[in-house]
Amino acid sequence: MMKTYLFDFDGTLVDSMPVFGKMMKHIFDENNISYGEDFIKILTPLGVKGIAEYCINELKLNMTMEEFFKTVEAYFYEEYAHNIPAKKNVIEVLNTLKKEGASLNLLTASPHFTLDVCMKRLGLFDLFDNVWSCDDFNTTKTNPEIYKMAAEKIGVPMEEILFLDDNYNADKTAKQAGMKVCGVYDDSSSEYETEIRSITDYYIKDFSELLSICFS
């Protein structure tokens, strides 16, 4: 049985990607910013600071960093604190793993002000040994070093950790860093399913499938 897990949050444990996509499209449209269909794939591993820098520097969004943060914070907090649900079977599976003695850890691009309140509302926060935002490491999930730093903090060799994420770039980087990787289906990344399957050790469409991997 795999004993140590490192989970993504958005699109992996909770059904939040439609909220993120809707908000970013609203910001882009209001500011006449053109964007490709793959913008979610590009933005989600970056963290709030990285997203702001990318939008302002690369997409020429006419906002200051502070203005961007205020816009995002107000929109996101309301959704994460009150509305965003856990994905199907997530709560049950995480509780099962915890009862079996697994170490549950989380690494997400989301900031703590939305992450923590959402996890506590869903009853997930206390199941985890570590809950990290990329901000805690001052880097993003596209940098292999973040996975090495997380493994060091957990105190387990890289190859003994199963990383789970719905994002292709994060999965690819974690795999290159030396972790075992399980891709997770999400509607927002469904078009990249074949790509994700090609670079991961496992792939699940429903969270209940994780148990067969864990106990194999």
Where are these regions (language model features)?
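An amphipathic alpha-helix signature
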Residues: G21, K25, V48-E53, M65, ...
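Asp-based, Mg2+/Mn2+-dependent phosphohydrolase catalytic module
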Residues: M1-K3, N95, P111-H112, D116-S216
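Active-site neighborhood of HAD-like aspartate-dependent phosphohydrolases
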Residues: M1-K41, Q176
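Helix-loop "lid/cap" segments that line or gate small-molecule binding pockets
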Residues: I27-F28, G47-L61, C118, A150-A151
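Short, acidic loop-to-helix structural element flanking the phosphoryl-transfer center
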Residues: E78-L106, H112, D116
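Conserved SAM-binding loop
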Residues: L13, A86, L104, T139, ...
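Metal-dependent phosphoesterase signature
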Residues: Y54-E92
